[in-house]
């Protein structure tokens, strides 16, 4: 009889474990519920100015000439016939020098259309004796690089990147834009690039780089959403050595109601001079969620996550309007999820050691009134290098191991799209979509979660999670610029968001999140940003508010530099 009773107790415990994992709000990646650092937007880290040619003197433009011969010199990179035939119809005609210059400008446009950034044609000073007209084509290139400001130990990296520009003769716009924007991948740097037009007919000019470097920075993101106040503080070092490294350490304070501890380290080093960046990331997290739907208050839950990862990213496309960044990463993750009855001591322990390879593409398109971003990733788990999973049920002094439902060889795909637009009357809109799909039951660290700023403003951070899910948000805003020293921008907005999650082992609760919100953002465009909003849940009831009461959210970010 006792054996049968124990069997039923174990089956009941297993069922309870499945229900708990299917319904608890924190079953997803716990890092998704941490405060975010949203530093004020300071503008691009790289600005470019290519100085135009000096205009011709107006008093010369009306002078008449009848060409008998055109002598075109300096053409090397474009078929000569394409240049000379532009001037042939002018032979024997009474024209002005202004018309000659207009034709030469057409040659300049031809070079620009072919992608030669510094090349141009002009009519040099001459007597036009016997109707002979000289046309000079300057195929421009950068012969020298002048670095000013505070490059520090990063100057060697800067010059190595600039060497790609000086090596391209004549300089093509694609080369120029790619490597000037590669400066922006160096940590802590702000670069202003200026290229004066060539002053000699050989086409040589100087690339002037004004560099500002922030060697250290401390930033913080503070949330008032949990409930209580929590902040993620990050200290960063940028390029103190010639390696051009960036080292940062982050910590969560205080532990808060869920007794969370989180510490992370990140180190990145540029490799070569073409934009390749390697990165090492390590983090450890521990928390005891207090809101666990479907479980009595006597059950205590403990979540642990440790992660170590290596990645390499490379800009496949990089210019002034668009970029495409490819990233390959591999990481190992250790996860523990424990449910324990505080009265009886009975417990359910789920553990996993995950080994994952992930590939990701990040695309950005920027125009005067619109910014688009698209991120796509595919991840595959492998049962190698110590990967494992286990689930233990302890009743009294007896511990029984059962099969864990999670997959170590899972496949996970995801995508995120955002678009912001600026319309007349300073009206702005923002649309964001995200989704994740997996045909497998995922380990804790691989699940997708929603709540608060993640597509559910009316809910707590990490309110719900699942193996698959999607979210969307819409926002309409209107920016005001009072121009005050400590408040450069005020942006009121209204927003709507919704999210859905799905599990292979059950139905999460809540699973259908929706909310409407009204809020305002403040920033000085340098040091701080403050986001305040009131959000009303209109989907499933939140774990902490069955009446769907409005929720006040506040997020504050600050950086020293």
Language model feature labels by segment:
Residues 218-222, 247-251, 278-282, 326-330, ...:
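Membrane-embedded beta-strand positions of outer-membrane beta-barrel proteins
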Residues 338-504, 540-545, 554-559:
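C-terminal outer-membrane beta-barrel translocator/porin domains of Gram-negative envelope proteins
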Residues 507-561:
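C-terminal beta-signal and terminal closure region of outer-membrane beta-barrel proteins
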Residues 18-22:
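Sec/Tat signal peptide C-region and signal peptidase I cleavage site
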Residues 23-226, 250-261, 265, 411, ...:
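Periplasmic polypeptide-binding modules associated with outer-membrane biogenesis and secretion
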Residues 151, 155-156, 172-370, 537, ...:
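Gram-negative/organellar outer-membrane beta-barrel architecture
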Residues 9-17:
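Bacterial N-terminal signal peptides
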